[in-house]
Amino acid sequence: MREVRRLRGEVGRAIFYDDLEREFKEYLRSQPIGLARPEEIQYALENPDGLIPPITEEIRPLPPNFHHELAKFKVTISDACISCGLCVELCPFGVYARPEGLNKLLPPTSANCIGPLCQEKYPDHYCVDKCPTNAIAIEREPTYELLGDPRWTADLLLATYKMAETGRAPEHLEYRVGASGGGFDKIKFTFESWRVHKSTPSPSLLRGRGEPRGEGTRSHEPSTAIPLNRRPWGPKIWIPVPWYGGGMSYGSVSLQTMLSRARAAKAFGTFVSTGEGGYPEALYPYDDHIITQIATGLFGVREDTIQRVRIVEFKYAQGAKPGLGGHLLADKVTADVAKMRGSVQFSSLFSPFPFHSVYSVEDHKKHVDWVRATNPRALVSVKVSTPNDVDMVAVGSYYAGANIIHLDGGYGGTGAAPDIAKKNIAMPIEYAIPKVHKFLVQEGIRDELVLMASGGIRTAYDIAKAIALGADGCVIGTAELVALECNRCGNCERGRGCPFGIATTDPELSQLIAPDWGAQRIINLFHAWRAQLIEILQELGMRSILELRGRVDVLEYIDEMKDH
């Protein structure tokens, strides 16, 4: 007999994961539903009113913040080296360098080395074989084995570092998936079958979205833009990429980290959330790209901060710890954080689990109406975790007047949430997306809501898979911190625990992150992700990321493939 665990409050019904997986497999075998409207796709392609903002910053390669860059391979040069410089000429990856006027080589940049793959793909450039004195050796870097976990593998961490440095995906590292054995790691795109049938129109094209494009007609880059308001009223807001930054409050991360994220969001024409810790004045120049969050603790919530922004988010629950409320331990509550939150310095802060003023959809609607009365130009987002009845929650938020439903599954968060909560309470996001998408279609309201997904979104491929399952876009967080060289050590809850100055409020450690450096690293990562999304769309013969929504026919479940 299976053990059933009930969580008081949000998860009103127990979740049986075997049942969820069975329903999920059936969904992947079903016909696509809830596809985007033709006129919306056409708008994304033409941008007639100029609502889709341009991306204003280009890739600018940036070195890591610290002298010792983590690497997968270690390159060593023995005393047998005669400094002939042949390796400098041969290596196309910049591992070796000898400044003009010097006879000696500089120490090799091991992080640029692609290891044995070089011998396989570029034998004429493989330094180990070409060195006249056999002075070069390449071996696995010992610290590589200590990095990461099954969800964020060492390869995925290093690949994200490299994309944040160069704006391009590294060929020698696995940057698409992790090794968790579940979640998005068990889902793959069926590119091979689509390459065979490229002349066949996709279902979205057959619904009148234009003629299918062959190889010779793909002259324009696919659009990655999505709308954030599908209601017939309210401001029409588009973002040029299908993601924005999730809530990380002042206190959970440093002000420098918040500034880095805000500047990157502005450069990419998208948004980033303040989290529940208030709205620091340093973010005021980025008002048009900020989402201010109203959570159950109401920390730092003021009418003037609601009036500053274009999107206001109600956080009813967090996928990493649903039913537990927000936690900020005493170490991180410095004088500035306490002032922002209206609390006492070095006292732990706990948000209650529910809004004690909301016990029905009608109460929820009063919240939404309050925001609209305070700021008529703001869109309203509702962030919920993923209980078994999350589909009903989403419909309730629709009737309360929300523009955006933000589903937050388990495995999200920076590391401060208890592991037992992250791994055992919320429904995984890949199960929640189809459940909500399908129910909204059945209710006839899918084309009036924007469905954003978060909770373990690590890569551009995760974003694309979430959209193919039925989401409109994704909300990201940890990946941005990894771009700032987070190594996922898990010390986020401590005031001086983060050695990189990311998730800390210590005034000295915070200075390790220069906002301009951090912003450009995130911008570079975003460029790499967008390029990967464009490649995915081109492989599938799609003109817009909007065409990918609900297209489960381009996905395959890895367990299913093993069965055949």
What are these model-predicted stretches?
Residues 1, 69-73, 83, 88-89, ...:
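Glycine-rich phosphate/ribose-binding loops and adjacent secondary-structure elements
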Residues 2-74, 79, 95-111, 128-203, ...:
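Conserved, well-structured core domains of diverse proteins
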Residues 78, 85, 121, 125, ...:
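Electropositive phosphate-/nucleotide-binding environments in soluble metabolic enzymes
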Residues 87-93, 97, 119, 124, ...:
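Secreted/processed peptides and extracellular or luminal domains of membrane proteins
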Residues 105-123:
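Aromatic/His-enriched, Gly/Pro-containing loop or helix-boundary segments
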Residues 207-211, 215:
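Glycine-biased, low-complexity coil/linker segments
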Residues 313-366, 373, 388:
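Active-site cores of enzymes that catalyze phosphoryl transfer or operate on phosphate-rich substrates
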Residues 509-528:
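Anionic ligand-binding catalytic core segments
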